[in-house]
Regions:
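Intrinsically disordered, low-complexity segments enriched in Gly and acidic/Ser/Thr residues
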Residues: 175, 187-239, 243
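A short beta-loop-alpha structural element at the N-terminal edge
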Residues: 4-19, 28-30, 141-155, 163
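Conserved donor-binding loop and adjoining core beta-sheet/short helix segment
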Residues: 22-91, 200, 208-228
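Acyl-donor-binding surface of acyltransferase catalytic domains
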Residues: 77-139, 285-293
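Conserved GNAT-fold acetyl-CoA-binding loop/helix
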Residues: 25-42, 163-183
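Conserved active-site alpha-helix within GNAT-family acetyltransferase domains
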Residues: 108-124, 243, 255-256, 267-285
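Conserved acetyl-CoA-binding loop-helix of GNAT-fold acetyltransferases
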Residues: 82-96, 229-232, 238-251, 255, ...
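Conserved GNAT acetyl-CoA-binding A-motif
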Residues: 97-107, 253-265
Length: 293
């Protein structure tokens, strides 16, 4: 756009960018109350980026960060009074990332912002969601324990196999049984985790993992816990085992006074996408993804 000036993001832009982000988050809270509140918006602005100025007024900003594998725009990484300007900012910033994989997190309730990224060839990869806990218990569900580790290995291998199949086509690599055992070995001694299993006829056929996630980003409300994992064996899918795990997790959180449960899932995982939406989880953010070229 000829009347727009694009500049590197600097400290002089912090105040105006934080104001844009605050406006975006206020709109988001109007549609979904279970998000972060009392936010220091300046502190949320992380990474290197660019701004779009019109007549000297900041109208949009974009901040990115890189890992060894990809580049990403986090929950506070973009906001705009004129969303179309984000396309110009991406064109200016993305070459600096020198990464083929790009991901961006945008509010699910902001269609103008989502549309901009769709028109930059990004697609929806993950849904991040939230809901309130409610009283309840799941039939056949109990707390997990260390002697469930053999079944945990079986469930984790089954989950990886499921994600690698169509239509997910995940690049997730199958770990060895020993690697899974090592990953899970300390779970039952770590107070951040709550492991649940569901039994049928005396056999564990599924499990769930609750995780006390640290607050700090716009997605995480106060006093929440994350439902990090729900997996059942293929032969019991559709029999209510997964529903029992979720009901028990919601009830466990309710009994302990949590105000919210967060979750995320891969939308191309058809079982997960339909299952969690049907259980009252409301989308808060979309993780959009693009592979270049």
């Amino acid at each position: 756009m000829p009347d727009v000036e694009i500049r590197p993001f600097s400290d002089e832009h912090l105040g105006a960018a934080a104001a844009l982000l605050a406006e975006r988050h206020e709109r988001h809270l109007a549609t979904e109350p279970l998000l972060a509140r009392d936010v220091d918006f300046r502190a949320q602005l992380r990474g290197e980026g660019v701004v779009a100025l019109r007549d000297g007024v900041l109208r949009a900003y974009l901040l990115g960060q890189t890992t060894d594998d990809d580049a990403f725009v986090d929950f506070a990484g973009c906001a705009a009074a004129e969303p179309e300007l984000l396309r110009d900012l991406y064109a200016a910033l993305a070459p600096q990332w020198a990464r083929e994989r790009h991901r961006v997190y945008v509010p699910a309730s902001d269609p103008a912002l989502v549309d901009v990224w769709f028109r930059l060839a990004f697609g929806l990869q993950f849904t991040l969601a939230v809901r309130e806990p409610v009283a309840g218990r799941g039939d056949g569900v109990r707390l997990g324990r260390r002697d469930d580790l053999d079944t945990v290995v079986e469930l984790e291998q089954s989950f990886t196999d499921h994600l690698r199949e169509a239509p997910s086509f995940s690049g997730r690599q199958r770990e060895t049984d020993e690697e899974i055992r090592a990953d899970w070995q300390d779970t039952w001694d770590d107070e951040r985790f709550i492991h649940l299993v569901v039994e049928r006829d005396g056999r564990v056929v599924g499990h769930a993992l609750l995780y006390r996630r640290e607050p700090g980003d716009l997605r995480i409300p106060a006093n929440c816990i994350d439902l990090a994992l729900v997996v059942t064996l293929p032969e019991v899918r559709g029999t209510g085992a997964g529903s029992a795990l979720v009901a028990h997790a919601l009830g466990w959180a309710h009994e302990r006074g949590f105000d919210a449960i967060t979750i995320d899932w891969r939308v191309v995982n058809l079982l997960a996408d339909r299952f969690f939406r049907a259980r009252g989880f409301r989308p808060t953010f979309m993780r959009l993804y693009r592979h270049v070229p």
